[in-house]
């Protein structure tokens, strides 16, 4: 296993030379996380999200960083986004529901969470339809 502190040093140098390089920023965020510098880790990952970095794992890294910073509401929210992108509805719903406990009702974040819950819940009725189709086929 490599030395995360040394990697962080070299990645910081590379980031100074090429601050727009998303791969460097991602690697630097991971190095910050590995060395326990969770705030700078979070800052790197949020920068990538704002640049619409095309990596669904970014929500996972953001969630982990918020968790290490003991910001449970944000952590659950980003885990919800991660699992939603992974098409794991039950895990996404679990985290979104947990996140709601940390935000005031009517706040921008609470509304976004509620919208995500409703969107995921709206997909649920598709399962019973498949079962009823299967039952009709069995009885034939």
Question: What is each PLM-predicted segment?
Answer:
Residues 27-28, 61, 78, 95, ...:
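Canonical tetratricopeptide repeat
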Residues 85-140:
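Terminal, low-structured helical/coil segments at or just beyond the last alpha-helical repeat
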């Amino acid at each position: 296993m490599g030395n995360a502190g040394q990697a962080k040093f070299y990645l910081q140098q590379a980031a100074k030379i090429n601050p727009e390089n998303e791969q460097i920023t991602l690697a630097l965020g991971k190095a910050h996380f590995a060395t326990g510098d969770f705030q700078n880790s979070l800052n790197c990952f949020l920068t990538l999200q704002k640049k619409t970095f095309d990596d669904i794992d970014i929500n996972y890294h953001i969630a982990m960083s918020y968790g290490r910073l003991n910001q449970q509401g944000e952590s659950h929210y980003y885990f919800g986004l991660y699992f939603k992108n992974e098409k794991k509805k039950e895990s996404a719903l679990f985290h979104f529901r947990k996140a709601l406990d940390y935000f005031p009702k009517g706040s921008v974040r609470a509304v976004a969470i509620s919208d995500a819950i409703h969107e995921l819940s709206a997909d649920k009725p598709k399962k019973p339809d498949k079962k009823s189709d299967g039952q009709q086929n069995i009885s034939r």
